[in-house]
Amino acid sequence: MMKRKIKLALADDHMLFRQGLIALLSDYDELKVVTEVPNGLELVKSLKNRPVDVAIIDYEMPEMDGLEATRQIRLKYPDTKIISLTMHNSEELILQLLDKGSNGFLLKDFDSEKVVDAIYAVIENGYYFNDHISKDMLHYVMKSKKLKPKFGISALTDKEIQIIRLICEEKTNKEISDILNLSPRTVEGSRAKIIAKINVKNTAGIVLYAIKNNIIY
C-alpha cells in the first residue's frame, strides 16, 4: 500500500528561496508542496480549501508576518504543524513564536537533511529544535508548558541515563568517555542508540526528553 504523501505549504516573500526549497523537497517522493505563497495572509486564506500537514513559514514577510500567520493557523487549523523560518537565532523570537503555536524552528542556512528532519519531527513528535538552542531555553520551554512533545515509550539502561545526564551538562563524547571510563566510539554508539530509542532527531531532542521525563531537573 502506498503511503499518503505529507502535504506542505510554504510561505516566504522571496520567490527564489521558495523555488529553491521546492526543488530541494521534490527529491523526496513522500513530500508534496501543494501551496507556495509570498506572505502569511495568502497562506491563511489558502488553508481553507487546501489543508496541509505542515506549513513552513518565514518570520519576516509583508502584509502578514510569520508571527501573526502562526497565531491564526493555530487558531483556525489546530492540527496543522508549523515550522518557522528565521535568519535570527533569538531566544526571545523563539518564545514569541512558541506562544503563537509554532512546532519548530529552522535557521535559513539549513541544508536538505535538516528541513526534511524537521518535517518528520513535527509530524512524529510534535516539535523540532536544532542544536543551537540552549539547554536553559529548552528547560524553560518544557517547564512553561509552551510545548507538549510526544515521545515514544522506551526502556533506557542505567548507563544510557548516565550518558543522557552528561549530554545535558553539555559534555563532549570525549569528556563522557573519560568520566564513564568508556571509549569515545562506545559513547558515540550509545548516543546513536539513545536517539533511536527515544525517537528524537538530535541533542536538543535528548535534552527535551530528559526534562520531560525528570532525568534532569
Regions found by a protein language model. Give the residues of each.
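Receiver (REC) domain active-site loop signature in two-component systems and cognate sites
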Residues: 61
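Basic, Lys/Arg-enriched C-terminal extension of HTH/homeodomain DNA-binding domains
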Residues: 192-217
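Acidic catalytic/metal-coordinating carboxylates
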Residues: 39, 65-68
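Short amphipathic alpha-helix used as the core "switch/output" element in two-component signaling
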Residues: 45-46, 67-79
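Active-site residues of response regulator receiver
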Residues: 58, 86
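Active-site beta3 strand of CheY-like receiver
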Residues: 51-56
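Regulatory hinge/linker segments at domain boundaries
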Residues: 138-166
